[in-house]
Amino acid sequence: MRVTDIISCALLQASIALSTPVEELGAKAVVAKRFPPVPFLPGKASSVPGSRNKTCMLKALGGGKDDSANILSAVKQCNNGGHVVFPKGQQFTIGTALDLTFLNGIDLDIQGTIQFTNDTDYWQANSFKQVFQNATTFFQLGGKDINVYGGGTLDGNGQAWYDLYAKDIYILRPILFGLIGAKNAKISDLKFRYSPQWYTLVANSSQVVFSNIDIFGDSKSKNPAKNTDGWDTYRSDNIIIQNSNINNGDDCVSFKPNSTNILVQNLVCNGSHGISVGSLGQYPGEVDIVENILVRNISMSNASDGARIKVWPGASSALSGDLQGGGGSGAVRNVTYDGMIVKNVDYAIEITQCYGQKNLTLCNQFPSNLTISDITIKNFKGTTSKKYDPRVGYVVCSSPKVCSDISIENIDVKSPSGTNLFTCANAEGIQSQVNCTVEGDKGGHS
């Protein structure tokens, strides 16, 4: 079944009964938002959340004092059917790594601001180590039947990290929001600000919805905020990311290894590296699968890419000291990008099996062990930047044996000079679909 087949997914929210007198504390608990049924999702419907029958109202200590212990206590008290409120107008400080992977039937109603401390030494030593690309997280949130919402802000206090990374690219920079081992979780109506690295990691999770998330964070110094992906999914299934605004400096969304049955829709992305499959095939001996992905109705501005698939070649290569790899195996299959408006992007479409390898002759000698097949990219409109003018796209496979059934249709994208050329190689049938030029020397950027 193709990913574009409509499969209804009823996303029902809990009705919450509040039992504590929260009004006397000068704050108000808010019931979790309801989501309408969502078409297009190629996965299973979410299960019905349970009821909520108790409320824990937090009060910030203030003055930069660590609220972590009080937060942990409230979460434990209101777990299994409760509602934790971070009141509006209060700023909570987290200076201690929190393991919240025990959650069950709980609403985290973040109306105020949660800010993580900028103690880079502490966080490098104590943040939670994840298993992919040296990823770490400030906290781990997991379990089942979880709602996180409220209109508030999570602030990663990233400036100290941007400046430190400029001096040492091997530091471990925490991810702002770590959803680890979650099932039936809904995260909505929140602002994510100034993450040290990726904004969101969704790992080993299923039946998850992100909706109405506003992401923003830039650097106030000469040192840019790098690797600030909006979302990265990893070993996760049945995920929705929708109705959000993202201003960042790396992938708007990235499907990392073993991401399946994912719907991404109605996003406005600015300053990113596109909506990306990968990178994949980075680690020898690992099998990476990304399949059944639908990306639809996207606005992409001032970005390196619109739609992007990036796969490492069969031999080791390096983009930088902290990003190198190649030789892994697996497959990318049944991926559809349908509907994207692009403005000032370097490439509207980029598919490469030579990621990290600028010498394409060497890449062709050691083709990727990871296959790309059944890819549909259609209904794109807009303009590219001057960077690769006169080209607007790049489709370069390492061998026709590992790259097949790529369909590109209804692409109305022009370069500044008015052309619509693609660099093409080793992709059977692509010459009849787009205006191909000779093979270039680009092996993929970070």
UniProtKB/Swiss-Prot annotation:
It comes from Cochliobolus carbonum (Maize leaf spot fungus). Residues 1-17 form the signal peptide. Disulfide bonds join 252-269, 397-403, 424-436. GO terms for biological process: cell wall organization; pectin catabolic process. PANTHER family: EXOPOLYGALACTURONASE X-1-RELATED, PTHR31736. This is Exopolygalacturonase. The gene is PGX1. Belongs to the glycosyl hydrolase 28 family. It is an enzyme of class 3 (hydrolase).
